[in-house]
Amino acid sequence: MPPGEGLSEKGVSEALALRTALASEEVDLGVATPLLRTQETLDLALGERQVERVVLPALREIGFGAFEGGPLAEYRAWAWSHPPDAECPGGGESRTEAAVRIAGALDALLDLPEEVILAVSHALPVRYVVDASDGSFPTARITPVPHAEAFFLDTDAVRLAAETLRAWAAAPSFADLVA
């Protein structure tokens, strides 16, 4: 069984709503992270479609280190007061490390032969990709993304997101960072 907790009742409802939202959309491949809840979301969203499903570890959530499993507010307080290249205490990832990893995941998706890919990930990777798909750099205080909501990005937007994340990671800063 994959690691992590499965979907809550609300999560199941959200994944089923995603299935309805995607009912008329073509999907050639489904991609999830190693965590059980993303795989369950993907399976529910795809329903009975005969679509290959794969796990792409590089799409996982940021490594929270010492904050893993604790209140998200504690991680946010730390993140809002440290630069993006600061290593997260307890062996976690810096935001720049996560951005480079996510850019690599996008490259891997772009290299696949399938044209339409449904990728299920986590809050920070999704926000970073959506923002970077229009050339925007990540912010310290990310705007939350709704659970199980579809964001439609074409190949050019995904390529721009990967390039933008790498460019930001090479010279990281947060305009909204509290010193």
Q: For the regions a protein language model found, what residue spans apply to each?
A:
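Active-site signature of alpha/beta-hydrolase-fold catalytic machinery across serine-
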Residues: L44, Y128-A132
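Generic beta-sheet signal
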Residues: E115-A123
